[in-house]
């Protein structure tokens, strides 16, 4: 095949080894010859042809290594893995020449947390701009940063409230007085439900709600480990989330 190098020492992968003879026979039967010279030619070489911007791919790989480091640190803090697993990721980081300082969104979240003295979060949008969210009496940092990101994406003034406190306060009362929760602040899922309700009568809220798909692929960081609920919302929205390996509170049990 023109433009594809055939290596003397190919690298084999199980699925490539298994399927290559079958595909090779099919191509020879249909076209008279196979475009692939080996298992590697069919697999790794073809994947390499998909890289059209090497700088972008290298940066994406660096960010993935850093994300895995943060995930490993959090898993260790939660008792899921031991220190040896974290050490292996640290070795990988050193070999790749990357550090946590290369994750700009983490620096933004930690700076905001230091300024406010409370947990904070940050999201880096596709255009590179970083928005932050702080903990308030109404919202947790993860909920606040999602709203702020939607405002930025929709060109909405950050001074304009998308959801009236009149809507938020009854939800807080339900959580604390009826359901017995100690934390009155709204989680990410609760704020999105409140936003969708507001969107029925508020065009600005409806505009913000339409921006949700644009969060997919964005980078985010929290200054504390998020709850399972918030973590799940970020994952479902397609946001690449990392967290500092510490909890907001010193409780013995965390959900």
Label the predicted regions.
Residues 2-9:
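Short, small-residue-biased leader/transition segments that mark boundaries at the very start
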Residues 3, 81-86, 122-127, 184-187:
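Short amphipathic alpha-helical segments, especially helix-boundary/capping motifs
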Residues 3, 95-97, 155, 217, ...:
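Glycine-centered secondary-structure boundary/capping sites
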Residues 10-24, 31-53, 63-68, 79, ...:
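C-terminal binding/interaction regions
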Residues 12-13, 70-75, 89-183, 202:
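Conserved mixed alpha/beta catalytic, RNA-binding, or beta-rich assembly cores of soluble enzyme
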């Amino acid at each position: 095949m023109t433009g594809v190098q055939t290596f003397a020492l190919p690298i084999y992968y199980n699925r490539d080894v298994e399927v290559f003879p079958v595909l090779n026979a099919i191509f020879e039967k249909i076209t008279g010859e196979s475009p692939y010279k080996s298992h590697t030619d069919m697999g790794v070489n073809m994947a390499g042809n998909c890289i059209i911007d090497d700088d972008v791919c290298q940066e994406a790989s660096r960010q993935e290594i850093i994300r895995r480091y943060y995930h490993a640190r959090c898993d260790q803090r939660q008792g899921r893995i031991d220190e040896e697993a974290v050490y292996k990721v640290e070795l990988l980081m050193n070999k790749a020449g990357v550090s946590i300082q290369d994750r700009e969104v983490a620096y933004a979240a930690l700076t905001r947390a230091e300024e406010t003295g409370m947990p904070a979060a940050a999201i880096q949008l596709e255009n590179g701009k970083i928005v932050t969210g702080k903990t308030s009496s109404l919202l947790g940092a993860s909920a606040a940063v999602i709203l702020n990101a939607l405002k930025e994406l929709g060109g909405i003034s950050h001074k304009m409230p998308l959801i009236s406190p009149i809507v938020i306060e009854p939800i807080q009362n339900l959580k604390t007085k009826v359901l017995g929760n100690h934390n009155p602040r709204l989680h990410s899922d609760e704020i999105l439900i409140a936003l969708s309700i507001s969107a029925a009568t508020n065009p600005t809220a409806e505009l913000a709600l339409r921006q949700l798909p644009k969060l997919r692929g964005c980078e985010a960081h929290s200054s504390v480990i998020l709850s399972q609920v918030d973590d799940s919302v970020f994952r479902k929205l397609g946001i690449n989330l990392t967290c500092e390996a510490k909890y907001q509170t010193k409780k013995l049990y965390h959900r």
